[in-house]
Design a protein with these regions (language model features):
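Short cysteine/histidine-rich zinc-coordinating motifs and their immediately flanking basic loops
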Residues: 71-75, 112-117, 171-176
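Immediate flanking context of iron-sulfur cluster ligation sites
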Residues: 47-55, 87-104, 134-160
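Short hydrophobic targeting helices and cationic amphipathic motifs
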Residues: 3, 24-25
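Long, hydrophobic N-terminal alpha-helical segment
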Residues: 32-83
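Mid-chain, well-packed structural core segment of small domains
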Residues: 107-141
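Local cysteine-cluster metal-coordination motifs and their immediate loop/turn environment
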Residues: 56-68, 97-113, 154-172
Length: 176
């Protein structure tokens, strides 16, 4: 499983965005675990790919500046940000997502900091008036995150104990 994850991340890095999206769809739509596959499927009745996103990552991406756990993680996060900004749809997902795939806390699809980040996710959902499993455009989501959390100075209430908090405090949100 570990080797499959490494190969998956290496495959991601050598694929162009359009090829990656096809790879992504095959990777998740063809999953054996249908409950997990449902989180990654195309939107109802369309061929448009809907990318799962942990709600708290809407805040992480607002302040992301190329720092992170490793060079591989930051390259992956930067590429995911580009993909999301192309107008993709997301499905709010309180579990590991594609950003998590390059994180050292991801162990076989489960986050070692699972309880803490699930609290972050649920707090973002609550403050934004959204629900787990909800599908929307990334831009709609970031607008809610900016208006309901970041502009209201509520970020620290949600994730002030995050190890990356100082990065967020140093700069302005890219969603502003």
């Amino acid at each position: 499983q570990f080797l499959a994850g490494v190969c998956s991340r290496l495959s991601f890095r050598i694929l162009s965005r359009s090829h990656w999206l096809m790879f992504y769809q095959e990777r998740y739509v063809n999953m054996q675990d249908k409950s997990s596959a449902a989180a990654y499927a195309s939107d109802e009745g369309t061929e448009e790919i809907v990318i799962p996103l942990r709600p708290h990552h809407g805040m992480c991406l607002a302040y992301f500046k190329g720092e992170g756990y490793s060079n591989g993680f930051t390259a992956h996060m930067a590429e995911m940000l580009k993909i999301f900004l192309e107008g993709k749809k997301i499905r709010l997902h309180v579990d590991t997502d594609e950003i998590c795939s390059a994180c050292p806390n991801n162990r076989g699809g489960h986050c070692e900091a699972g309880d803490k980040v699930a609290e972050y996710d649920n707090a973002v959902l609550k403050k934004c008036g959204l629900n787990a499993g909800q599908t929307l455009h990334f831009s709609e989501f970031t607008k809610k995150v900016q208006e309901k959390i970041l502009a209201m100075d509520k970020r620290k209430e949600i994730c002030g104990n995050c190890q990356w908090n100082s990065i967020c405090e140093e700069q302005k949100s890219r969603w502003a």
